[in-house]
């Protein structure tokens, strides 16, 4: 097979984007394999910067590593070109598998298609395949997909988060100390026991050399960017978020897709300031597209348990507010975890309703405008299409797999939870996947379904029902034992009650208690 991406035939949508279908995925897998078994375009084109802590990783799966200040002082481009990253790139180009990318290797070793393949098919990656294969790995390069957190200022303390990304977590750990699990055993673990909370993040009052370097580097990086995404903390609590918006208004990149994560639970005054800024950016036509991401992984009080500080009804209201605005997309981002299992179906029902209500069927709109025939088309969809010219889809869904902290990983759930909740949830979603030219995008996209499917299938293969010894395997027993201690400590600190909030998981809670007592020898 040719090593050239541009010489190959790819099945594309009508808008020119490459489809994430089985044929294209297999073709990309083979194309990457021509360079090496661990070759991944995301390592060369995607970066997430945690400027509050001075950490970076490429892509989002590997554990973040520190950006050495001595490297940064010599060259601000070290934000994306640390010696660590250059070494990993060289390994990929020389046919090796970097150890930090173990998530993808696990999926592939189980016979699946990992994010390495899916990400490499994205236009911000695939368009650069041919030039990347000519590199040695030691070059200073620019990303095409930049995600940045300016600090940990946040008004929430999600259960799966921590002090690196939440100032509320910092305050809780200062007040109560680290969360200890399986205490007194040889597998005792502590959540952020050895972290210097005073030095973990640069405060607003301190000079932050990483943010200083960012604003030196960003003007040079901007022309190379296809995606710029701001995350947190809570981005709306950072002045650099609003500085970014103003910078983009004054320095257009009309090939750029700009997006911001927000918990949508900030005070009204701050929310209104954000809405004003984002509407001015849209009216300036300085960027190609704008997307607002909001995180929620379950429904109602279960979602609020997982994300302490979340106002679920306010989030629902503000999601619809964004969906009704001109030419701005809203995407629900659900970091799938153990707390998602029993109410994710209700979340999907809501997202499906939003898609039905707000997503214009661009294919039928074009057909209507050309022929005058209204083929199964609501007239409101024509209006939505006209006021959203930059977006084929107004309401989207992303389902990343939460791997850390490990004791909140869904792979520790029981067979009953898998069979009674996850399989039916997957079936619900599969029945509403729309992949035809006729109905797109009134249902779930294939790529949205695939993300949930990979998570559920990973759980099924991790702990197979016909392998009885797996249910009592050391790793599973330890993870469940840790989970028991974790939720009990969260309940004590936050005045919550896991079993009252998740009565359908009471049996799982007891299984975790038994695992905990087994390890502790009770």
Regions found by a protein language model. Give the residues of each.
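N-terminal pre-triad scaffold of radical SAM enzymes
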Residues: 45-56, 135-164, 226-230
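Radical SAM enzyme [4Fe-4S]-AdoMet core and its adjacent flexible, acidic
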Residues: 1-58, 62-71, 119-121, 170, ...
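Membrane-interface junctions of multi-pass transporters
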Residues: 33, 61-108
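Preference for well-ordered, secondary-structure-rich cores of eukaryotic proteins
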Residues: 50-55, 61, 106-119, 140, ...
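Local cysteine-cluster metal-coordination motifs and their immediate loop/turn environment
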Residues: 39-42, 97-109, 153-164
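Short, intrinsically disordered, charge-biased short linear motifs at domain edges
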Residues: 22-29, 80-94, 142-149
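Core AdoMet radical
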Residues: 143-153, 164-209, 222-239, 251-274, ...
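Recognition helices and adjacent regulatory flanks at domain boundaries
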Residues: 111-145, 154-156, 177
């Amino acid at each position: 097979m040719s090593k050239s991406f541009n010489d190959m035939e790819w099945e594309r949508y009508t808008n020119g984007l490459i489809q994430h279908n089985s044929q294209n995925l297999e073709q990309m897998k083979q194309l990457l394999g021509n360079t090496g078994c661990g070759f991944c375009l995301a390592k060369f084109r995607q970066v997430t910067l945690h400027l509050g802590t001075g950490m970076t990783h490429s892509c989002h799966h590997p554990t973040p590593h520190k950006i050495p200040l001595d490297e940064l002082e010599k060259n601000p481009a070290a934000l994306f070109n640390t010696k660590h990253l250059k070494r990993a790139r060289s390994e990929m180009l020389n046919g090796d598998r970097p150890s930090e990318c173990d998530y993808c290797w696990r999926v592939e070793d189980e016979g699946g298609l990992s994010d390495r393949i899916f990400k490499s098919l994205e236009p911000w990656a695939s368009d650069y395949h041919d030039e990347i294969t000519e590199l040695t790995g030691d070059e200073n390069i620019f990303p095409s997909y930049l995600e940045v957190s300016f600090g940990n200022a946040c008004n929430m303390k999600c259960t799966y988060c921590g002090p690196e990304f939440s100032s509320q977590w910092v305050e809780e750990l200062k007040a109560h100390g680290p969360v200890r699990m399986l205490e007194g055993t040889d597998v005792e673990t502590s959540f952020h026991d050895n972290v210097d909370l005073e030095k973990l993040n640069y405060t607003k009052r301190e000079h932050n050399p990483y943010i200083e370097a960012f604003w030196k580097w960003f003007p040079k990086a901007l022309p190379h960017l296809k995606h710029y995404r701001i995350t947190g903390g809570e981005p709306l609590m950072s002045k650099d978020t609003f500085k970014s918006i103003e910078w983009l208004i004054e320095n257009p990149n009309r090939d750029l897709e700009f997006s911001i994560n927000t918990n949508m639970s900030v005070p009204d005054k701050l929310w209104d300031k954000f809405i004003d800024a984002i509407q001015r950016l849209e009216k300036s036509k300085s960027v190609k597209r704008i997307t607002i991401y909001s995180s929620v992984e379950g429904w109602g009080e279960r979602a609020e348990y997982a994300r302490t500080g979340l106002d679920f009804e306010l989030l629902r209201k503000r999601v619809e507010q964004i969906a009704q605005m001109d030419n701005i997309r809203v995407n629900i981002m659900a970091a799938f975890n153990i707390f998602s299992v029993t109410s994710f179906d209700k979340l999907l029902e809501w997202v499906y309703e939003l898609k039905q209500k707000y997503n214009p069927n661009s294919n039928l709109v074009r057909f209507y405008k050309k022929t005058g025939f209204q083929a199964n088309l609501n007239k409101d969809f024509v209006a939505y299409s006209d006021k959203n010219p930059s977006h084929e889809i107004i309401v989207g869904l992303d389902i990343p797999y939460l791997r850390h902290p490990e004791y909140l990983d869904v792979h520790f759930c029981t067979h009953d939870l898998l069979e009674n909740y996850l399989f039916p949830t997957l079936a619900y979603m599969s029945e509403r996947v729309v992949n035809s030219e006729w109905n797109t995008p009134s249902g779930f996209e294939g790529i949205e379904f695939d993300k949930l499917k990979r998570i559920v299938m990973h759980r099924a293969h991790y702990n197979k029902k016909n392998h009885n010894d797996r249910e009592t395997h050391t790793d599973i027993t330890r993870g469940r034992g840790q989970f028991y201690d974790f939720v009990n400590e969260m309940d004590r600190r936050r005045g919550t009650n896991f079993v009252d909030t998740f009565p359908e998981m009471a049996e799982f809670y007891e299984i975790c208690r038994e695992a905990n007592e087994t390890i502790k020898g009770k």
